[in-house]
């Protein structure tokens, strides 16, 4: 079966020297990820893999089946999805996850959940209704107070306004309680702050009206949807939705640290002009906290029609302060020309749309564009709205907006510019082009190219996958570590530089000097103390003793005087006789020694016993669970491959046989399974030739997909091993084994696909910086490919991970195509596979063009 984690990564174009561009070679780069950690863990633990089924990683061991009964397994699987990691850990340790019977716990949990949901639903309804009623009453109260300034002194009109307001309050409350969306059920959590009231009173009118016009473009500006019976309910619902939406947005950005600053620092002329514009627009639209209601006595059709331009200006200016995520990210509005001092003096962050002089993410080019727009438009509109000439206080720049008609609203709203990480592949092709493809992890050598191609003048890589650099960072490409040069600092003193000796070297020097001293001199000299001798001769396993010895001893050994009646060991042979099992040397202390030596001897013996126990524990840890077979233990190089036996063949314990070369030359089973799946899914093929079958790793996987396989190898021993392994997997009847040389048999063969996996020369192939497929293979890699082309153009070339990609691409020939697939095993680059002919998987765009 083909690997699930497979993707096209890049397209590489290689241009041939002294050839036209039409002869370039297209190399499609892809990656396939397979996992076999379970198989590797099975090899480390020494578990037996059952023979039923093909995927051994999903099987359990015989020991696990014996321990768990079927009933326990069913109960565990039923509740597995409801357990958190801690509960799973407790279950794996045999501890109870919960107390009481399962049925009781389940029924109690269901009933409690139903009660809690009902209570929460009732609370939400109650709080929502109370909260809406309070907000609507307060806003209508403010509305009535403002209307008192506009309406006439006739008490009948005031009474009529109050009655209408009361009726509208009741109808609005009922309508909002019914038509409120589901997302507004959390309204009680939104707090109406003073900043929000200022913001809504200043900009809510424009937001509501702009959204209403976008929603119903057919209605004229002179209409009053809040008073018309046909649109009154729609307007109330529209108001409720926008109010809660912008309140939620406002509180979100306020929690992020943004602050709203009212436009109080503007120039007098600018502020005056805006005031006049607001006064002119007041007759058409009355700003309040809840609706855009206006008195019939003051709202006239003539004023509405004449002030359309001013109304559009208000809407365009209000768009600056919409706290939407797009505009906050864009933040390229410039208000520095309108203000005496920048608002950066305000502590904390400021919303870029509220007049901040510095943009958060905008580039200098974007800010210049917005300056040209904003500096040109208001100067013209100030002359239209007020009689005073205010353009002399502001610089006037020539722009293209001056030629627009007077009816068009000023273009203050910034356009949404995508960042580099938001661009699609086709929108910014320059950033996706690379000349060397460093992030792909390929090796480019200078070896001879196939088919007489001199060399490649340049290569061009276009990445098809986003964040290739970031993703490649977490993949093990098996690159060589670059070691930085060390900077050696020499001291200014002319004396001999100090060279620090290692601990082991100083110990050896002390021991050899002490052992080689003459016996006569040792008797005449003062004896060593017992503690010093023990510190000098003990093993180097204990780091604490090493530290104490460094503190007390220098490069030369110091000796403490003791009484003359205390004798020392006469020769090194006696020391060796007294050597303990743990590897430490203990001096024998005679009875006539000083009392200090006798007092210290029990302590030394206790330390020696502790060391023995520690070393025994270490030896027990290093012991393997299952001993290596004799044939593996006799060859040290194969010891690490024994732990990987289930990665090579999941049914290893069923009778798989390998020779010495087969251990490190066979393809891991998961990679072989992926290659076989790709071949079977590419096109309808019947016969596959495995030119160098070895012990049958790839041959068996091809046969498991239902294909007929011709397995060829020049070594009769490997043919016998491959036949045995095929019988273990039950596919021997689908394979025809031929013992012979592929170079001689190739002209006589006919097949749909040829799989090439020639010997790589042993494990030493990985030590080379770049693997030359022509000189490092035996037989020649170019000759093998040439003979395979006589059989079919559908060729699979299995190569080392450090193979020269330029050589592999040259196999496609001028104007040809090849797909180079990187095979990752547990996120480690293991091998690469080159596909030719109909086996190439082309991207969707390429296949559509073809």
Curated annotation (Swiss-Prot):
The EC designation for this entry is 2.1.1.-
CDD domains according to UniProt: AdoMet_MTases (cd02440)
Describe tissue expression. A 55 kDa isoform is widely expressed while a 90 kDa isoform is detected exclusively in brain and testis (at protein level).
Extract the PANTHER family matched here: S-ADENOSYLMETHIONINE-DEPENDENT METHYLTRANSFERASE RELATED, TRIMETHYLGUANOSINE SYNTHASE
User: Where in or outside the cell is it found?
Assistant: Cytoplasm; Nucleus, Cajal body; Nucleus, Nucleolus
What's the name of the protein?
Trimethylguanosine synthase
Q: Which reaction does it catalyse?
A: a 5'-end (N(7)-methyl 5'-triphosphoguanosine)-ribonucleoside in snRNA + S-adenosyl-L-methionine = a 5'-end (N(2),N(7)-dimethyl 5'-triphosphoguanosine)-ribonucleoside in snRNA + S-adenosyl-L-homocysteine + H(+); a 5'-end (N(7)-methyl 5'-triphosphoguanosine)-ribonucleoside in snoRNA + S-adenosyl-L-methionine = a 5'-end (N(2),N(7)-dimethyl 5'-triphosphoguanosine)-ribonucleoside in snoRNA + S-adenosyl-L-homocysteine + H(+); a 5'-end (N(2),N(7)-dimethyl 5'-triphosphoguanosine)-ribonucleoside in snRNA + S-adenosyl-L-methionine = a 5'-end (N(2),N(2),N(7)-trimethyl 5'-triphosphoguanosine)-ribonucleoside in snRNA + S-adenosyl-L-homocysteine + H(+); a 5'-end (N(2),N(7)-dimethyl 5'-triphosphoguanosine)-ribonucleoside in snoRNA + S-adenosyl-L-methionine = a 5'-end (N(2),N(2),N(7)-trimethyl 5'-triphosphoguanosine)-ribonucleoside in snoRNA + S-adenosyl-L-homocysteine + H(+)
Q: How does it assemble?
A: May form homooligomers. Interacts with CREBBP/CBP, EED/WAIT1, EP300/P300, NCOA6/PRIP, PPARBP/PBP and SMN.
A single Gene Ontology CC term: Cajal body
Q: Origin, by domain of life?
A: Eukaryota
Binding-site residues for S-adenosyl-L-methionine, renumbered to this chain: 713
Entry keywords, A to Z? Cytoplasm, Methyltransferase, Nucleus, Phosphoprotein, S-adenosyl-L-methionine, Transcription, Transcription regulation, Transferase
Q: Does the keyword Magnesium apply?
A: no
Kindly give the InterPro entries that the UniProt entry links to this protein.
Answer: RNA_cap_Gua-N2-MeTrfase, SAM-dependent_MTases_sf
Organism for this UniProt entry? Rattus norvegicus (Rat)
Q: Which residues carry this modification: Phosphothreonine?
A: 61
Q: Where is the composition biased (Acidic residues)?
A: 424-435
Q: Which family does it belong to?
A: Belongs to the methyltransferase superfamily. Trimethylguanosine synthase family.
- Biased composition (Basic residues) is annotated at 611-624
Ranges for region Disordered: 54-85, 278-311, 327-454, 523-566, 595-628
What this chain does, per the entry, is described as:
Catalyzes the 2 serial methylation steps for the conversion of the 7-monomethylguanosine (m(7)G) caps of snRNAs and snoRNAs to a 2,2,7-trimethylguanosine (m(2,2,7)G) cap structure. The enzyme is specific for guanine, and N7 methylation must precede N2 methylation. Hypermethylation of the m7G cap of U snRNAs leads to their concentration in nuclear foci, their colocalization with coilin and the formation of canonical Cajal bodies (CBs). Plays a role in transcriptional regulation.
Q: Which GO terms describe its molecular function?
A: RNA cap trimethylguanosine synthase activity
On this chain, the residues bearing Phosphoserine are 92, 152, 405, 431, 571
């Amino acid at each position: 079966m083909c690997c699930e984690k497979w993707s096209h990564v890049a397209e590489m174009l290689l241009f041939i020297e002294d050839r036209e561009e039409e002869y370039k070679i297209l190399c499609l780069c892809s990656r396939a990820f397979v996992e076999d950690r379970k198989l590797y863990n099975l090899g480390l633990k020494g578990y037996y893999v059952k023979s039923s089924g093909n995927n051994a990683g999903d099987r359990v061991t015989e020991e696990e089946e014996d321990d768990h009964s079927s009933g326990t397994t069913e109960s565990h699987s039923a509740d597995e999805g409801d357990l958190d990691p801690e509960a799973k850990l407790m279950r794996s340790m045999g501890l109870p996850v919960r107390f009481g019977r399962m049925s009781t716990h389940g029924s109690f949990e269901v009933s409690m959940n139903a009660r809690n949901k009902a209570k929460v639903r009732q609370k939400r309804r109650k709080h929502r209704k109370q909260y809406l009623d309070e907000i609507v009453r307060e806003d209508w109260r403010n509305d009535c107070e403002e209307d008192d300034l506009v309406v006439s002194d006739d008490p009948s009109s005031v009474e009529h306004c109050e009655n209408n307001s009361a009726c509208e309050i009741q109808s609005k409350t009922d309508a909002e309680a019914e038509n409120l969306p589901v997302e507004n059920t959390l309204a009680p959590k939104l707090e109406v702050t003073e900043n929000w009231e200022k913001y809504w009173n200043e900009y809510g009118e424009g937001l509501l009206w702009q959204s209403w016009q976008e929603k119903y473009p057919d209605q004229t500006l002179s209409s009053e949807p809040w008073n018309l019976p046909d649109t009154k309910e729609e307007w109330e619902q529209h108001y409720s939705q926008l109010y809660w939406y912008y309140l939620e947005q406002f509180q979100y950005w306020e929690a992020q640290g943004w602050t709203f600053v009212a436009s109080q620092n503007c120039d007098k002329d600018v502020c005056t002009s805006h005031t006049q514009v607001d006064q002119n627009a007041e007759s058409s639209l009355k700003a309040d906290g809840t609706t855009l209601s206006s008195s019939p006595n003051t709202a006239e059709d003539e004023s509405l029609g004449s002030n359309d331009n001013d109304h559009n200006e208000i809407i365009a200016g209000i768009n600056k302060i919409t706290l939407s995520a797009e505009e906050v990210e864009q933040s390229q509005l410039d208000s520095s020309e309108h203000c005496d001092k920048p608002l950066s003096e305000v502590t904390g962050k400021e919303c870029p749309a509220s007049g901040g002089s510095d943009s958060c993410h905008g580039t200098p080019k974007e800010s210049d564009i917005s300056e040209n727009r904003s500096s040109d438009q208001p100067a013209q509109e100030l002359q239209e709205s007020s009689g005073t000439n205010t353009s002399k206080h502001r610089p006037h720049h020539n722009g293209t907006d001056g030629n627009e008609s007077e009816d068009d609203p000023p273009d203050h709203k910034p356009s949404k510019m995508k960042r580099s990480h938001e661009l699609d592949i086709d929108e910014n092709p320059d950033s996706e082009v690379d000349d060397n493809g460093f992030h792909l992890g390929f090796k480019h050598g200078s070896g001879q190219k196939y088919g007489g191609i001199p060399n490649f003048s340049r290569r061009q890589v276009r990445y098809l996958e986003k964040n290739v650099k970031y993703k490649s960072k977490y993949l093990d490409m098996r690159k060589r570590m670059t070691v930085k040069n060390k900077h050696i600092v020499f001291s200014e003193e002319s004396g001999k530089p100090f060279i620090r000796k290692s601990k082991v070297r100083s110990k050896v020097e002390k021991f050899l000097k002490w052992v080689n001293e003459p016996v006569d001199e040792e008797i005449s000299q003062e004896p060593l103390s017992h503690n010093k001798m023990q510190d000098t001769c003990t093993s180097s396993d204990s780091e604490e003793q090493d530290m104490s010895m460094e503190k007390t001893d220098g490069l030369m050994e110091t000796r403490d005087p003791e009484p003359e009646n205390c004798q020392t060991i006469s020769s090194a042979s006696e020391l060796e006789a007294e050597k303990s099992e743990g590897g430490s040397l203990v001096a024998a202390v005679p009875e006539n020694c000083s009392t200090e030596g006798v007092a210290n001897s029990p302590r030394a013996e206790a330390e020696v016993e502790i060391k023995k126990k520690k070393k025994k524990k270490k030896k027990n840890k290093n012991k393997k669970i299952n001993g290596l077979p004799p044939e593996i233990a006799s060859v040290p190089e194969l010891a690490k491959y024994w732990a990987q036996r289930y990665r090579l063949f999941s049914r290893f314990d069923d009778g798989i046989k390998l020779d010495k070369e087969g251990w490190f030359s066979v393809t891991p089973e998961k990679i072989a399974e992926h290659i076989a799946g790709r071949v079977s899914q590419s096109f309808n093929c019947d016969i596959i030739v495995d030119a160098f079958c070895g012990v049958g790793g790839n041959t068996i996987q091809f046969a498991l997909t239902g294909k007929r396989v011709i397995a060829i190898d020049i070594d009769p021993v490997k043919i016998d091993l491959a036949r045995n392994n095929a019988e273990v997997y039950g596919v021997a009847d689908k394979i025809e084994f031929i013992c012979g040389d592929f170079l001689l048999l190739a002209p006589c063969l006919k097949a749909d696909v040829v799989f090439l996996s020639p010997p790589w020369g042993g494990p030493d192939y990985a030590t080379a910086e770049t693997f030359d497929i022509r000189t490092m293979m035996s037989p020649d890699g170019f000759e093998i490919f040439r003979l395979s082309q006589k059989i079919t153009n559908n060729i699979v070339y299995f190569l080392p991970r450090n193979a020269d990609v330029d050589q592999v691409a040259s196999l496609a020939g001028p104007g040809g195509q090849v797909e180079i697939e990187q095979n990752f095993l547990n996120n480690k680059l293991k091998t690469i596979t080159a596909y030719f002919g109909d086996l190439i998987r082309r991207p969707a765009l390429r296949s559509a063009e073809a």
